[in-house]
Amino acid sequence: MSRAALLVLADGRFPAGGHAHSGGAEAAVKAGRITGAESLEAFCRGRLHTSGLVTAALAAAAALGVDPAALDEAADARTPSPALRAAARRLGRQMMRAARATWPHPELDVLARRFPKGAHQPVVLGLTARAAGLGPDDAAYCSAYEAVSGPATATVRLLSLDPFDATAVLARLAPDLDRVARAAAEAADRAAAEGVDALPAASAPLLEIGAEAHAAWPVRLFAS
């Protein structure tokens, strides 16, 4: 295993399509819930401990070898918004393309055939980590970081927020990232022993509501 593979996978320039999605930040900016660095930090912390925990646990479980089809079904059950489910599958399809080109692996091929329109992104992320020789802890960290880095980067574009301030927000969230990644990896261990019902099912209703409203906008900067 090369831990450097984690740097490649977590790099915002990895061609997995995440740059086109705001993680709910665009809807939150329009609603006035994100107005600057302080409110961005609150938004990211809330997202991290809810949907971020869910996706990190799914990714960790996939990296651990839990059945990806069962994990995909679990992801559907934990994503009430049709718009978010569709976005997760689009991102999963794009990540699959990047993963198969970067770390070819039979398990990726099997998942791609089973879900030709895309499996949920965290499931693909976890299986990609597995293909790269990484472990469930690595997958959990990568997914948890995506949960906050996406909105932070999007807010720089949406509000012309100083990139230094956005990066400082991410740095202040580091202890939360540690806690969420650790909880996600522990949940993945339970899922391997007890089944996917052992995975967390934390919810963030405003993210779901905002995603549905955002999907209906005639003009928007981000896909979700």
Language-model segments: which ranges?
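Conserved active-site and cofactor/substrate-binding residues in soluble primary-metabolism enzymes
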Residues: 15-23, 35-39, 50-57, 86, ...
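C-terminal auxiliary extensions adjacent to catalytic cores
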Residues: 4, 33, 37-42, 131, ...
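Internal, conserved structured core segments that host functional sites
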Residues: 56, 61-134
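Short glycine-/small-residue-rich flexible loop motifs, especially phosphate/cofactor-binding loops
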Residues: 25-26, 126, 153
